[in-house]
Amino acid sequence: MNNTIFDDVFRTMIEKMPYLAVPLINEVFHTSYPQDVPIVQLRNEHQQENGEIITDSCLKIGGKLYHIECQSVDDTTMAIRMIEYDFSIAVENAHKQGRRYRMDFPKSCVLYLRSGNNTPDFLEVEMVLPDENTVLYRIPAIKLEAYTKDSIFEKNLLMLLPFYIMRYEKDIHEMSENSELFQCLLNEYEEIRMNLVIELSGADKTALYMDLNKLIIKIADYICQSEEVVRKGIGEVMGGKVLELESERLRAEGEIRGEAKGEERLSILINRLILDGRSTEIQSVVTNAEIRKQMYKEYGI
């Protein structure tokens, strides 16, 4: 099983859209950071004598360290791996007070994309220190299956949307043969798309809408790769398949210049196309200036 795709998508969101992690941090650690809170991304590579370890994310917000790992399987060694990661992060950020060092462990959690009855709510390691004192290392385990599409939007946990299809992973084959179940799935994704349009309707959020859309399709393509009908259906509902982050490619090609007026105009056009069921035309609109000009005229924008 290719678990790299899940790591890649999660790290892409952390690196290119770190503000999406803020609502998740608020949910897990009961904080109340605003979504525009300053975020410092710390390096994910930590050098140890026996080699390098790589974490999924390490963020500094409000003077505190946060570490989130995305896990696609219920690995029983995860508690030990997490304390190893967190110890490395704490050592790298240790500060000296006279002859004494202080190490602050990050606030950490594991996001389980797949979980079962035996997946714990907390990962724990009991540490016996040299003076025989015992310290309990305990971090929360967050399970994707606990979040419906409604709770995701209610809590603004948009970071979970690309992985939403994994809630139905075991039912994909049955859906491909049962038109009623298949239509229920498509209806869910239609609601997801429309909610995204509402949540990300501002001119400054057009790029985020496109990026999330493509990541949703990327994971759905992978999960449904053996069921062409389901894979294609989700892709059509979400508006087409482009694996490269669309907004980044557009910026590289110079199609989006960043002028506020131009971005707002394009955002309005994209939203109109989505509402009219013309999502398949979005890519040509954002990549072809002539087609975009014609569409502006057609919609009177």
What are the language-model segments listed below?
Residues K60-S72, I172-I301:
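Short, charged alpha-helical interaction segments and adjacent helix-coil junctions
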Residues D86, A90-N93, E169, A220, ...:
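Short amphipathic alpha-helical signal-transduction/dimerization elements
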Residues F153-L181:
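Coupling/switch segment of ABC-type P-loop NTPase heads
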Residues M1-M159, A289-I301:
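Accessory alpha/beta interaction modules
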